[in-house]
Design a protein with these regions (language model features):
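Active-site metal-coordination segments of metallo-dependent hydrolases
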Residues: 87-102, 110
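Non-Sec secretion/translocation targeting segments of pathogen effectors
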Residues: 101, 164-167
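Long, well-structured alpha-helical subdomains associated
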Residues: 93, 106-165
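Extended, non-globular alpha-helical segments
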Residues: 28-52, 69, 131-156
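C-terminal helix-coil-helix/basic helical segment that borders enzyme active sites and/or dimer interfaces
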Residues: 81-89, 153
Length: 167
């Protein structure tokens, strides 16, 4: 057995952390989305997944609260982006779809003041092989982020508007 506290663990081991009102945001999103969400005990490497045919998201119940929220945003990005591609799903590769989903999740989290950069930036870089492809996917990311942002509690939206006005 080891001694010490979790502040001595690297971020990737202990999971994403933040001082966000996790439960309010999560409850609001779960009440508004048109896809089922289930929380299950999974291995530590798997944070969640979106099953397109079942129209369902599964999230690892072992995730930290913030990683749960980030994963929900990532899987919702898959849901909304794939739904918007009706008739042209073959246009995007698996790598590009992962890039869109994680970029969207990262941007939504950043808007909420949640820093997921230690996790998200390397993940995004892993999937980005072609800068030209990024330019083509930018609009898809913007649309996907917009759809997720509409799910946030009004007080979060107002906080974000106030932040934007100060900039």
């Amino acid at each position: 057995q080891t001694e010490g506290d979790d502040t001595q663990l690297p971020t990737m081991i202990k999971g994403l952390q933040s001082q966000v009102d996790y439960s309010t945001i999560l409850d609001r999103i779960l009440a508004k989305i048109d896809v089922s969400v289930d929380f299950k005990d999974m291995n530590y490497e798997q944070h969640g997944f979106y099953a397109i045919k079942e129209h369902a998201i599964t999230i690892n119940s072992r995730n930290s609260p913030v990683h749960t929220l980030k994963t929900l945003f990532h899987e919702l990005a898959h849901h909304y982006h794939l739904d918007s591609l009706k008739g042209r799903r073959d246009k995007f590769t698996y790598e590009q779809e992962e890039f869109v989903a994680e970029s969207s999740a990262y941007l939504v989290c950043a808007t909420l003041g949640i820093d997921t950069g230690d996790y998200s930036i390397p993940y995004i870089k892993h999937w980005l092989n072609d800068f030209q492809a990024f330019q083509e996917m930018r609009r898809d990311i913007e649309k996907t982020v917009g759809k997720i942002m509409k799910l946030l509690p009004e007080e979060e939206e107002q906080t974000n508007k106030n932040k934007e006005e100060k900039i």
